[in-house]
Amino acid sequence: MTESGSYKDTVNLPKTSFDMRANAIKREPEIQKFWEENKIYDRLFENNPGELFILHDGPPYANGSLHIGHALNKILKDIINRYQMLRGRKVRYVPGWDCHGLPIELKVLQNMKSAERQNLTPLQLRQKAKEFGLATVDNQRQNFKRYGIWGDWDNPYLTLKPEYEAAQIGVFGQMFLKGYIYRGLKPVHWSPSSKTALAEAELEYPEGHVSRSIYAAFPVTSLAEAVKPLLAEYQSDLGVAIWTTTPWTIPGNLAVAVNADLNYAVVEVSQSEAQSKFKYLIVAADLVERLSSTLGLELTLKATFKGNDLEHTTYRHPLFDRESPIVVGGDYITTESGTGLVHTAPGHGQEDYIVGQRYGLPILAPVDDNGNFTQEAGEFAGLNVLGDGNQAVIDALAAAGSLLKEEPYPHKYPYDWRTKKPTIFRATEQWFASVEGFREEALKAIATVKWIPAQGENRITPMVAERSDWCISRQRSWGVPIPVFYDEATGEPLLNEEIINHVQGIIAEKGSDAWWELSVEELLPESYRQNGKSYRRGTDTMDVWFDSGSSWASVVQQRPELRYPADIYLEGSDQHRGWFQSSLLTSVAVNDIAPYKTVLTHGFALDEQGRKMSKSEGNVVDPNTIIEGGKNQKVEPAYGADVLRLWVSSVDYSGDVRIGKNIIKQMNDVRGKIRNTARFLLGSLDDFDPEKDTVPFEELPELDRYMLHRITEVFEEVTEAFESFQFFRFFQTVQNFCVVDLSNFYLDVAKDRLYISAKDAFRRRSCQTVLKIALDNLARAIAPVLSHTAEDIWQYLPYKTPYKSVFEAGWVQVEEKWRNPELAEFWSELRKIRDKVNKTLEIYRLQKTIGSSLEAKVVVHVFDERLRQRLQALNPNTHGSVEKSNGVDELRYLFLASQVEVPSEPIFEEGDDAGIYIQVYKADGEKCDRCWNYSTHVGESAEHPLICERCVAALAGEF
């Protein structure tokens, strides 16, 4: 006779050394070392049979530490790359860095004493900037690798490398030779604080900017023929009324523009209230009422006419002795604000410049690099246009009787993105890329690209359709030089194919420092050295957007293992006006095609409340703290890279995304659930040899075949999620599969089969057959996201596998024959009944009628006859059940109860909606000492009097 409690060693409990805790701070670096030592990334590139897949990296700026936006971006890229590797494609990912430009220059200058700065040569500055950039690259590279990002980290692309710079000069050269690059005096965004021109992408428009706006009038000196008869009587006291938010541009005024199609009016000003000297004003007819209240003047309508008729009327400048014309502008002139007549200064505005060109007006911009008025501004010379210069102009207009009103005007105004100070529009000699020359081709190219989300196309299309020519020159020394020389005598630029090729060769060999190191003679081709002229080298460098925008040529086209155009570019949505656009423009200008086939964009990372992150708010989430933990590990535990990666997969990145302590904690819980599920699977397969223990599909019990159907559905949904880049669908599906399908259902039901049966029993091996399929596929499916966890699982597989790494095992594998919608429909119904049974058992448990569910006998009354008969068929102890039980598809196992009855004549309670009524009684018989089920057969075996008939059979190897 066996005594109580001594059966515990006869039960097959799960066995695995796979740790329940992730212990990521120790385990992840070990796994990364395993990948590196076994060269998994390189081996996949060599051995994968599929075609190339090239995701081209948009270069982060080599300045400062990584933030959560960097993590979001790089992890998204890595998820895509790893998925493509698992699908068998050859993936080569070359990370890059943007290393030139003003921000790095400013960092270097900020770290120097002002005395040092005074004596700094361009070459010394470049040397310091290079050192700073390279140190940042090293720091960022280490962090990116810790995120688990795979790539060519030993051979990244840097925009400061000679081979990169030379290819960039090549792009510039081809654009120049096609006639797309020219030098011109044009108004550009000028930053007095940085003393350089800026491109659109280098501007920001902070909230809260208020300008001093003024209404002013200029005296009419002659009338156009079309309005002479109508307006002659008012001419002696007539002024054209304008409105501007930049009074300092009035010294540059050379015209007033009207809209040809708008109606204009002459109004009489009630003299008592007027502070200006004009009795009559010309304004837009639709604005008379609004202006009357804004200016606080009574305005009486005298005559109306079309804007077109005003063309060639002239007026006198209120502050300078010159006459200027009224001209017809474009549809930028509206009655939304102002007076309907626009003060036009061709040296200070884009539209002004275009209109000025049409009328042959000179370009006047009496402002220097520092933002101070020049001698051309007469009495205002030396004053700063954004400060006392603005005030002086307003005062002078008032003194001249020209000012009608001044009022503050809040609006969006461009600031320098680095110095955070306002910019001005100012005409300077610059180098431009003429977008006009290839705009149509660029728009056509946009239409060939797949944009995800689709509205990306609607963002970039109007930007390219409406953008002005691209100012590509910068007055700074840390960058790639524009390879031009100027004739000392005439100032004429010298730039042609021979010059470009010669300079390109020098830079390929020596790097762009050579432009500053070598003499002009050495930089010039032989034929220009002794031709009787003397030249000086240009001092401008290229816009950094031209640097990064040339990466398709410097990297994708130049490296033999890559392929142009790239399959995909993926960056933040701000890059529609940045890198996506500069890359598109250069690629189309040179090759007539887009440099990418697909463009994917993501939003920005906000805190948990949806606020922007800022140091002052104290709501900045540092990716490094998530991975390695903070100073106080109790408050900020080390979660490891996989939790950060899981967060990236959980958000809908097509818009802005949120992150914070609570969200990260949730992610850690989800990873825990996935690990626990995997651990149970590993432990339950400890003694399973797939070669000899696998049960053929046709012989599997219904429950197992249903589970394989679910596995097919789940992993198809996961595949679809990765294919469509909707990783949040992967996150939801896998989490749901682990918790709802496995833990709460299949594994819950399986424990009896796995623990209680004989090791080799059919009911146990059939279950293990399904568990192996679930485990292999779960590891593969999470590998793109939870890369370390997946590899960890793979390294603990208890059975032989031909694949050293999960990434060599390929993608999930499901079979078409597993799909069985009819079976699934019935089992879904069963699962609903199971939920109902569980709820009822819970009520009885709370009433203390039963303890565990095994203490219960469950009676299920089913109203629907067809369903009742199907349930009875799964219940061997129901009268009328003909099939012998397979020890799996029984209701008692499904409900975890000791006995289940399905009466042929059901009874009903009122209010039962689903036609199912459940009763719970205490189970019949005694508790088995081994499986804890209740049975009326406990005690029948003389050898084992304390256990039930199932356990007696199991010990004999028969169950």
Swiss-Prot record:
L-isoleucyl-5'-AMP binds at residue 571. It comes from the Bacteria. Zn(2+) binds at residues 928, 931, 948, 951. Belongs to the class-I aminoacyl-tRNA synthetase family. IleS type 1 subfamily. Catalyzes the attachment of isoleucine to tRNA(Ile). As IleRS can inadvertently accommodate and process structurally similar amino acids such as valine, to avoid such errors it has two additional distinct tRNA(Ile)-dependent editing activities. One activity is designated as 'pretransfer' editing and involves the hydrolysis of activated Val-AMP. The other activity is designated 'posttransfer' editing and involves deacylation of mischarged Val-tRNA(Ile). IleRS has two distinct active sites: one for aminoacylation and one for editing. The misactivated valine is translocated from the active site to the editing site, which sterically excludes the correctly activated isoleucine. The single editing site contains two valyl binding pockets, one specific for each substrate (Val-AMP or Val-tRNA(Ile)). PANTHER family: ISOLEUCINE--TRNA LIGASE, MITOCHONDRIAL, SOLEUCYL-TRNA SYNTHETASE. This is Isoleucine--tRNA ligase. It comes from Nostoc punctiforme (strain ATCC 29133 / PCC 73102).
